[in-house]
Curated annotation (Swiss-Prot):
Signals that turn on the gene: Fluctuates during the cell cycle, being low in early swarmer cells and rising dramatically during the G1-S transition (when tmRNA accumulates). Decreases during DNA replication in stalked cells to rise again as cell division starts, reflecting the stability of tmRNA at all stages of the cell cycle (at protein level).
Protein name: SsrA-binding protein
Gene Ontology cellular component list: cytosol
Organism: Caulobacter vibrioides (strain NA1000 / CB15N)
Predominant place of localization: cytoplasm
GO molecular function, one term: RNA binding
């Protein structure tokens, strides 16, 4: 896995990520060229079930600058490519258990294909977010204290 094109940094703060999946994305040529320039935003996006498919909604891939009038729509719905068993598992979790599909990271794989890391997630309540923030602060303070004790 190479350097991410786009990351959803709020995903791990707002949700408990139970399981992650690597999904391909159906893109047009101008979308691929726009991604190659490193321009994308998945912070406000989510994945949803439409029929027996899973689609990425509200992901922003800006229009390619050197394209002609056949450029793509920036926030169109994009189909995610997963194995049928994975799709069925995700559909069951979303519809029966009330889980959410959250995009975590958009990146190029070793073969040069655009991949999306999707997390099967459960929403956090406000007190869970506070607990997460307190734990993160404690880990930071602990690391700072350990660093101070090292060379004295």
């Amino acid at each position: 896995m190479s350097k991410p094109i786009a990351e959803n940094r709020r995903a791990r703060f707002d949700y408990f990520i139970e399981e992650t999946f690597e999904a391909g994305i159906m893109l047009t040529g101008t979308e691929v060229k726009s991604l190659r320039t490193g321009r994308a935003n998945i912070a406000e996006s989510y994945a949803s079930v439409e029929g027996r498919e899973i689609v990425l909604i509200n992901a922003d891939i800006p229009p390619y600058g050197h394209a002609n009038r056949f450029n793509h729509e920036p926030r169109r719905h994009r189909k995610l490519l997963l194995h049928r068993r994975q799709i069925d598992k995700l559909i069951g979790a979303v519809q029966r258990e009330g889980r959410t599909l959250v995009p975590i990271k958009l990146y190029w794989n070793d073969k040069g294909l655009a991949k999306l890391e999707v997390g099967l997630a459960k929403g956090k309540k406000l007190h869970d977010k506070r607990d997460t923030a307190a734990e993160r602060d404690w880990q930071r303070d602990k690391a700072r204290l350990m660093k101070g004790d090292r060379g004295d």
